[in-house]
């Protein structure tokens, strides 16, 4: 691993933390195209597994800050929705071995473009002023959302937060201020619960001079996660300053750019 590669990973770690804190997405949308660009020999499953593992680390850092801010969320919702994500991620990971790589990348690109459009539309809507109590319908619909989102996350390595945040934002029991907290909780709990499948399955590719178990490369994860500490304090300060409209527009443009970039990288170049 050369200096250029390490520098790129450090930048990704710093930017991933900002994305996780402000938008409630764990950086998987950033890491997937970066890993595909820098490590061209990686199997698509290794890209997904390493990306999702990085998301756990960056989300865990932000969770520590969120807990200190004492923003309340439903414990039952968090556990059930995280369980749905675990199931979905495992199904997506194993399904990826039966799909052509171009199909998986196509799903990733389509997800980015759909989410960007949805985010642009959401930016024009007023912020939710009040929320309802968590009910059975919210728990059920939320679990279906997270299972489906987890499947796409396990298939593509997106991380889940970019999918979960727009989905759970639609639930009447979730306030906008809770979206990032719920997403980060699910990325940590759902991600940790999903790592077993990545660790026990033998990977046909091993990167030299790095520490790797199964499909997860811990050297890459360590560099990205440790560098994310650099922007953690700044991310939380920025989160308090930005308005909902600015946040939604910024996220929409980021998702749109990543979708276009990945398309060019995989299908044009």
Where are the regions that the model predicts?
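Juxtamembrane transmembrane-helix boundary motif
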Residues: 1-21, 32-44, 63-155, 170-171, ...
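Transmembrane helix-bundle signature of multi-pass membrane transporters/permeases
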Residues: 17, 48-56, 180-191, 255
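Transmembrane helix boundary and interhelical junction motifs in multipass membrane proteins
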Residues: 23-32, 155-167
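Generic alpha-helical scaffold signal
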Residues: 25, 29, 54-57, 73, ...
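Alpha-helical transmembrane segments and their lipid-water interface positions
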Residues: 28, 55-66, 92, 190-198
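Small-residue-rich alpha-helical segments with characteristic i,i+4
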Residues: 164-188
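Structured core of small recognition/catalytic domains
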Residues: 180-184, 190-193, 198-204, 213-215
């Amino acid at each position: 691993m050369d200096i250029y590669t390490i520098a790129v990973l450090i930048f990704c770690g710093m930017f991933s933390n900002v994305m996780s804190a402000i938008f409630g997405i764990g950086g998987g949308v950033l890491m997937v195209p970066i890993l595909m660009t820098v490590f061209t020999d990686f199997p698509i499953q290794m890209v997904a597994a390493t990306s999702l593992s990085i998301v756990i680390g960056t989300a865990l850092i932000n969770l520590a800050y969120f807990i200190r801010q004492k923003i309340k969320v439903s414990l039952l919702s968090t556990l059930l929705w995280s369980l749905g994500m675990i199931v979905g991620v495992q199904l997506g990971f194993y399904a990826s071995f039966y799909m052509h790589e171009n199909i998986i990348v196509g799903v990733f690109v389509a997800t980015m473009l759909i989410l960007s459009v949805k985010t642009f539309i959401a930016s024009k809507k007023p912020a939710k002023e009040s929320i309802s109590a968590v009910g059975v319908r919210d728990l059920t619909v939320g679990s279906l959302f997270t299972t489906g989102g987890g499947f796409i996350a396990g298939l593509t390595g997106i991380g889940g937060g970019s999918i979960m945040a727009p989905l759970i934002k639609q639930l009447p029991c979730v306030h906008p201020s809770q979206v990032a907290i719920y997403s980060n909780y699910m990325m940590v709990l759902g991600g940790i619960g999903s790592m077993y499948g990545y660790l026990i399955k033998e990977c046909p590719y091993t990167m030299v001079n790095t520490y790797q178990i199964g499909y997860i490369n811990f050297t890459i994860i360590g560099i990205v996660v440790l560098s994310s500490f650099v922007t953690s304090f700044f991310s939380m300060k920025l989160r308090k300053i930005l308005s909902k409209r600015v946040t939604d527009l910024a996220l929409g443009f980021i998702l749109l750019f990543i979708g276009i970039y990945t398309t060019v990288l995989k299908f044009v170049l």
